[in-house]
């Protein structure tokens, strides 16, 4: 999204502006692990629902310690999908699925959420398997154009990778990427 904003602050302000202008019965889906998002809580005028893979919540979608994706409404918890049944790679995709479930819960049948969560295999350019050649699988993650997205992609694999990266400077910090490259990339 930074391709459409002059810097990170403008992007944050645009997101905050959406929250400020929403009114009930609008649903505001907020990521609990993101401290910037948590800081926007006071700007919310609609119904707040959270998504989190590290904490349980009384209102929103979360990943329970036993590996179940759950939805809570006023403290009533409904497990809806086992993490092991999700086809997408990476914990960031678990977070995406939790956010999607929080956004549509009560508007679409739970069975539809379960079906999508257990059958959807991804979109082009996002950790997309491209080819297997001589026992090596090649993935296209060209959508990963920021350090955060590149880190999420690297963390999606259990083995060290060969990374081919490039792009242009978006004027955001790249320092968090260095230890992840050391940890996840073959040298």
For each feature predicted by the language model, list its residue ranges.
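Extended acidic/charged loop-beta regions that coordinate divalent cations
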Residues: 1-4, 38-84, 123-126, 130
